[in-house]
């Protein structure tokens, strides 16, 4: 019989080798693919490095932030970046490597450097800007003619969003009869970009029914705004056949979506106010012309 190791012996050798080679923490960059907080307060993550063939990651690993460290790490990260730890965000984490005979390889996250994520977000934002400008689509939506009377409005937002409710309430205070059609979409989170693009495509299928599109979100923190700097969504907005008005609801930075839209305002309420003022102006002009 050949000399052999039992499975547990092999696993223990692997563990001992890793423990010796990585006795101290190391810094690792990766993208968060999944993140969840369990009932005990521990944070479990799936980390990936993209770049493999056919959309398959080059590398993938499980990670954990124990409850005792999670509040500190997550709180500091959000305070510095304006973003919650979420799927789709790239991070630089200080980790201890762990190997268990039953549960395999994992990373224990001890700290996260928010400056890395800030730099990566800004880098991706600049890449989007430069690509849209290079492709010659940067000004297309602004060149769409906006009717004097903007009355038939397609709204891309979430039905549950406070910003959507604020927008409708503000228009409801006016004496004008706006026709509003909601195209429901996720406005934050990992699926937001795909959901908003799908909603815009649905509007495009009925473009003759509308004068303009209003893209609004509001309420909560400034987290989950990355999709409004993403190339695919911003390219859709830039080349959309109807003028798009944005009220994304953040004050610190102007998103690329704002930059390529026909008209950008800070909040959903501000968009509603702008539309009402435009109607008031048209009404005043008609009254003057009738004299």
Task: Tell me what each language-model feature is.
Residues 150, 154-291:
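Short glycine/threonine-rich loop/turn motifs
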Residues 1-215:
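Acidic, two-metal ion nucleic-acid-processing modules in DNA metabolism proteins
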């Amino acid at each position: 019989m050949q000399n052999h190791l039992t499975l547990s012996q092999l696993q223990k050798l692997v563990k001992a080798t890793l423990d010796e080679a990585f006795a101290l923490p190391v810094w690792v960059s990766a993208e968060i693919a999944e993140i969840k907080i369990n009932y005990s307060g521990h944070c479990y993550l799936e980390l990936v490095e993209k770049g493999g063939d056919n959309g398959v990651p080059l590398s993938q690993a499980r990670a954990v932030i124990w409850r005792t460290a999670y509040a500190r790490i997550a709180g500091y990260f959000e305070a510095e970046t304006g973003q919650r730890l979420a799927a789709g965000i790239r991070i630089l984490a200080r980790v201890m490597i762990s190997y268990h005979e039953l549960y395999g390889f994992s990373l224990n996250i001890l700290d996260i450097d928010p400056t890395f994520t800030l730099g990566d977000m800004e880098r991706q934002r600049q890449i989007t800007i430069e690509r849209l400008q290079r492709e010659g689509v940067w000004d297309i939506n602004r060149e769409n003619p906006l009717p004097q009377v903007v009355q038939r409005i397609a709204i891309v937002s979430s039905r549950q969003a406070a910003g959507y409710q604020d927008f409708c309430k503000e228009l409801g205070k006016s004496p004008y009869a706006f026709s509003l059609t909601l195209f429901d979409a996720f406005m934050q989170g990992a699926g937001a970009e795909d959901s908003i693009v799908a909603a815009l495509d649905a509007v495009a299928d009925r473009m003759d029914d509308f004068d303009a599109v209003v893209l609004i979100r509001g309420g909560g923190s400034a987290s989950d705004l990355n999709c409004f700097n993403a190339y695919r969504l911003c390219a859709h907005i830039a080349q959309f056949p109807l003028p798009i008005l944005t009220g994304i609801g953040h004050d610190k930075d102007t998103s690329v979506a704002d930059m390529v839209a026909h008209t950008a305002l800070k909040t959903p309420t501000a968009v509603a106010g702008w539309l009402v003022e435009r109607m008031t102006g048209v009404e005043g002009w008609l009254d003057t012309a009738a004299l």
